[in-house]
Amino acid sequence: MRAVETIVRFSRLEPRLRLLATEAVLNLARARLAIRLLPFRRAIDFGAIPLGEGRGEDVGAIVRSVEAAAWRLPWRSVCLDQGLALQRALRRRGQDARLHYGLTAPGSGPLSAHAWVVLDGEVLLGGERAGSHCSVAIFPAD
């Protein structure tokens, strides 16, 4: 039943949002494959593409499309999948989105990793856990 509802909702979206949703699903799938099949350094390059031409698109709509698609996919999309997918979509549109990769601070509990996306100093995705992690790398590096 959930699949049918998702298809019906998708068909009711305005064309611009339908295109964003399709791009989000494709980027999430490609990011997941890159993470599973490639060495980390090559996989991380999936999102760190050269900046495209700016189109003045609604950044919030792009973020929401990645978040919504991640919830509806038949596999679990983790923060790194989502971060790479969002970073790629934004950079393609000329937005200098940066993917931060962080680890929990020493002595603050078990080691865990997290990824979040920052644009112009604002955390767009993954911010709910970013505060408990220390950024150890930013992609692309300056």
Give the positions of each predicted feature.
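Secondary-structure boundary elements
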Residues: 1-78, 82-85, 91, 110-112, ...
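Short, well-structured beta-strand/strand-turn elements
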Residues: 93-107
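N-terminal amphipathic alpha-helical segments
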Residues: 139-140
